[in-house]
Amino acid sequence: MLDEWFSETFPELSRARNLESVFDSWDMPSEDRRAIEIVKKYAEMYQDCPGIRAGLWLYAGDWETAHLICQSDESATGSWWHAILHRFEGDAFNSKYWYRRAVDHPVRDLITFDPQELVEYSQGKNEGRLYLQKEEFFTLLRWCVENRK
């Protein structure tokens, strides 16, 4: 399972911040000071991997830092993270724009849904959305780690 992969890959971070505390919300994950301090260490380890850094900052709840990273990363990976950030923010128009820029990303073949549809699905509060958010986040982050992106 993807959350087991996360716990094995980022053990200190997964102990600091329970997965459910990030994905049980309909909105942007709240900022977690302890997780932010841990992500600072990982950010140094992955300084050449903006996709990993953006995902970890999002996990820690630091939207601003994750957004700055995405804005400076013009790759499809940066665009995908950018789309996720704007979806969490409730900005459907921007989210769809960034998903269109990531249309050829390899992660599209690894998830079970169309991320553009998730933007529409995100407008309502339902458990299915939470599951898909979690699947998308961990699939993209795992791809970034495996490909050093």
Regions found by a protein language model. Name each.
Residues M1-S72, R101, H105-K149:
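N-terminal alpha-helical interaction modules that lie
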Residues R53-A54, H82, N94:
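Structural register within alpha-helical repeat arrays
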